[in-house]
Design a protein with these regions (language model features):
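Charge-lined substrate channels and their catalytic hotspots, especially those that engage the 3′ end
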Residues: 2-126, 135-181, 212-222, 227-244, ...
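Catalytic nucleotidyl-transfer cores of nucleotide-processing enzymes
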Residues: 167-172, 176-205
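Catalytic-core elements of nucleic-acid end-processing and repair enzymes
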Residues: 131
């Protein structure tokens, strides 16, 4: 596996900006950049206290790639919405649409790339973890692959995301949107009452998420609020919770650390402060 070389911003000649002022930028030629250009801060302008101004400043100062090349966008636009019968016959996928899956993420999550399901069995619980099959769309050395390698990751700013892949993939075909058939890779296994895993298999699949849930909803359900979840998914979520407790118990017995690390949250007022 080859990783893209890290990009380093040279800030040796960084100037000083007075308070309440924001630097603007212009493009200048640079032989080592991918497209022959780089952004360079050259002057300051009165600060407009709003989200757009702050995020444009962050994008410019960090040299983040905020636009996709035309050929990358064209490659993403070629993919059509999924036709389940075609996906099952052409790509030899296992049909898991009847197996109730849910996604569980934070309230502010902007992409949903994994879904889970579980059911009680004699030996314990059978669980399914399904992730979006990005490799189906992003082939090695393709324009999409090269752009993803160049970017390395999606960048999450407080109220927006600079995605690693173009929107037709990042926010649609590779996002496990409730009620939409999606190409996935599934890891299926049995977890016994001691938290041991067995009968593990990984295979290409087709799922259809039943609900987009949040950690807050699930925690409220665990705390006894029966109205926290849609009734249609409550039984499956209960099985997911019980299976996860078995896995967690075994991890702790093996010496795993359980760290409660607070996550920063950026809150803006209406003026963008």
């Amino acid at each position: 596996m080859r990783l893209a070389k890290p990009r380093v911003n040279n800030r040796k000649n960084r100037g000083t900006i007075k308070s309440n002022r924001s630097p603007s930028s212009k493009r200048s030629r640079h032989p080592r950049s991918r497209n022959g250009h780089r952004k360079k801060s050259v002057q300051s302008s009165s600060s407009r206290r709003n989200d757009r101004n702050h995020f444009e400043l962050a994008i410019n100062s960090l040299g983040l790639p905020d636009q996709f090349p035309k050929k990358t966008i064209a490659a993403a636009d070629r993919f059509k919405e999924i036709i389940p019968d075609d996906a099952l016959t052409q790509f030899e996928r296992r049909d898991l649409r009847s197996r109730l899956h849910v996604t569980i993420d934070g309230e502010d999550a902007k992409d949903f790339d994994d879904a889970v399901s579980a059911c009680k069995e004699k030996a314990g619980y059978r669980i399914w973890i399904s992730i979006a099959d990005v490799a189906h769309y992003v082939k090695a050395s393709s324009p999409l692959d090269k752009e993803a390698a160049f970017r390395g990751t999606s960048v999450y700013l407080p109220t927006c995301v600079i995605p690693m892949l173009p929107e037709p993939l990042a926010n649609n075909l590779c996002s496990l949107i409730p009620g939409q058939p999606r190409l996935t890779l599934t890891c299926e296994m049995i977890v016994d009452t001691n938290g041991n895993r067995s009968h593990i298999s990984i295979y290409p699949s087709l799922i259809q998420s039943a609900a987009r849930l949040t950690y807050t909803q699930v925690q409220s359900h665990m705390d006894g609020n029966q109205a926290a979840l849609p009734e249609s998914v409550a039984d499956t979520v209960n099985d997911i919770i019980l299976a996860s407790k078995l896995l967690r118990q075994q991890r702790l017995q093996k010496g795993s650390l359980d760290l409660e690390v607070p996550e920063p949250e950026v809150i803006f007022d209406k003026a963008g402060n």
